[in-house]
Amino acid sequence: HVVYIIKENRTYDQVLGDMPQGNGDTSLVEFGREVTPNHHRLAEDFLLMDNFNCSGILSATGHQWTDEAYVTDYLEKSFGGFTRSYPYNGDDALAYASSGFIWDNVLRHGLTFRDYGEFVKTTVKPEGSEWMDIYNDLQNGTHNVSISAKGSIEQLTPYVCPTYPAFTLRI
């Protein structure tokens, strides 16, 4: 199995700079082992990648680099205004590279995958449910709140975990 985890908007040094196995700057650690024990455990048990650079300078281009290894000319030129959309989550087909996504390559090679959040839209019902509503529903076992997910690109939907919430600050 390959597990591909995307950690956005944090530098290596901010999160894993306190790991002696890596080439980090401990003076830049903001979210060290005490705050991110799961990240540290994954790095210790599997793989620690330091000195790894990403060309994305914001979510819109970062997700394209992460998912396609390429940013289209259209996206680069839209950077200043995003008049059609902000395509960080698959909302603008003009931003897609003709070479396809990482999951297209997986499928071309006869392999399988499961998506837990990338290019996924989450629906929480009842609409307007906030974090405490969701938490209390879970704790009380009342099942009044439902969380569902589907691909923001339709071809991705069969591979999305339908109950795993993508990025949302409500949960």
For each feature predicted by the language model, list its residue ranges.
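N-terminal pro-sequences and low-complexity stem/linker regions of secreted or lumenal proteins
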Residues: 1-171
